[in-house]
Every structure is written in C-alpha cells, then in structure tokens.
C-alpha cells in the first residue's frame, strides 16, 4: 500500500476509534486471544464430535429433537459442567417443567442456579438480554423456543390467528442478543421442538419452531434422537441416543455422537470411555472380556462400567488419553495446514 493510502487509512481508523471507542476496529491478527473457550457437554463422545471439546462461549446454540429425546438432560449436563468450572448459570423455564430433584441428580447445584418462569415470550427474551448485558452470567438456557408465547397471543382469544408473531419476536431478539452475548462472553442455549411441514412430498418434512432467524444466528445446532432402549432384564433403564452436529461454526460439522442416557443419572460416561477406548485401541476386547493395559476390567460392558466406577483413577486416565488423542484446540488445525504449506514451499524451492 502506498504512503498516501496508508495515511488515509490511519486517519480513518483514528477517527473511528475516537467516535466509537478503542477496539471498535482492529486488524484481525492483532487479537492474540483467538482461542475459543468451550464448556464440556458432559459427554466425551459429543465433545469430540463438536471438534472443540464442548460448546463455545459467547455464542448462540440450538438443541432440537422429538419429545423425550434428552434435550433438557443435555442442557442440565452442560450447566453442571459450567458450574464445576466456576461459571454462573441461568435457566429460563418457559415450559414451567423444570424438575429440581432431577437437575440435582445430574450434578447441578440448584442453590447457585438462577431460574425464571416468565409469563410471555417477550418477558423471557428481555430477561435473557438483561442477564447477558449484566456481564455476570456465563450460561443461559431457554427451555423452550416453542413455549415462548407472544403477549398478543396470550391476551387474545383461543381461535385468533397470530401469523408469524413468534418468528418476528425471535428475529428481533436474535439481532439484539448476538452482540450482547459476544461482549459478555455468555453462551445462550435454546431448546427447540420439531414440527411437520404440510404438503412436503420430497425431502425432510421436519422443521423447528420460531422461524428461520435462530437457524442463522446459532453457531452450533444439535439434533438429538432416541435410537433404542437400554434394558436391565425386562426393565427399561435408559435410552440409546444419537446426537448429530447439524451446524458448526467452530469446527467441521455433520459429525455424530452415539451415547447412552441413563434415567436419573444422565450420560453413561463410563460406557462412552469403553466404546471409544475399544475404537481407538486403548481398551482391548477379546470376546466378551474387556481389558486395559493387559489387566481384565470386566466381562461385558455393564461389568466393565462397574469396574470403572469403583476405580475412578483408571477412568480418568483413559479419558485423558482419549482427549489428548482426539481433541486439539480450535485453530491448531489451521496452524498444521500452514506448516504443511510452508514445508511444500520449501521442498519446491529446494528442487529449483
């Protein structure tokens, strides 16, 4: 760039900073803290599928799926992980269905959890905005988008038509929230429900409620489905669950996590460790027997899980090895790619 352009740019940058404050414009490389902070989902398989070790702070996340698929359980697991890291969390219970006893069983400190049961959708979103602007809250969960009822609909009659009211309300909220959440480094998780589109002949007839704004503004979208039942004899004790990363702005999307949700316990972490350990050859499997470092840990997955519960040091060791092997900080892939490019360049120059 020639000197005149350089001077003009410096003057423009100076004027912008004077008018809007320091840091209102900068060169992207000047920002040294480019690593994205994440919060674990409580499931190692899902953390790996997300590529960054968890859900990103300062972003909007959408979790959707059919009824009783584990949406609220997943968010309560995220809250428990965030609280363990010393973060302040809030739960906006628009469905008026939060069970404090179940939340406690999943490891949530209910004495420290902020909870609101708003009367209208506008009130719920104003509370979210106020909490984000305070800068004191690190994680907000809204359960659910479908239950965010506009004030006009609540005050109207049963048969009244309110076309697009909820979508307009959410669209405005997304525009206001995105910047405030980023500035406060606060994550907002929206739980959503599934509806069927009428008259769809080809393609997927499923859609989520609340219009398209949330789909655009969300950095991560997770589709959670129940794929089967876990039985102990004749008794059903949990669900086989598949979670698909439908959208991901912080790593590669479309990865899937297969996990188990046990009733009253949450994710079957030890089961995940065994499955991932076998897949990545840290745990050996011979017939029905599982062994680690040559020592048998159990016959069958259930007995192996019990062994890991009784020996948490082994479970921690396997988890650490898996995290070191499968998770790299966001941005490391870019650095590796740059190193490869430089190596190719050097090789080409050497050949000349």
Swiss-Prot record:
- For the region Disordered, give the residue spans: 332-352
Q: Name one GO cellular component term.
A: cytosol
Cross-referenced SUPFAM superfamilies: P-loop containing nucleoside triphosphate hydrolases, RecA protein, C-terminal domain
Its GO biological process terms? Answer: DNA recombination; DNA repair; SOS response
User: What are this entry's molecular-function GO terms?
Assistant: ATP binding; ATP hydrolysis activity; ATP-dependent DNA damage sensor activity; damaged DNA binding; single-stranded DNA binding
Family per record: Belongs to the RecA family.
Q: Which PANTHER family match?
A: MITOCHONDRIAL DNA REPAIR PROTEIN RECA HOMOLOG-RELATED, RECA
Q: Fetch the HAMAP family from UniProt.
A: RecA (MF_00268)
Q: What is this protein called?
A: Protein RecA
Recorded source organism is Photobacterium profundum (strain SS9)
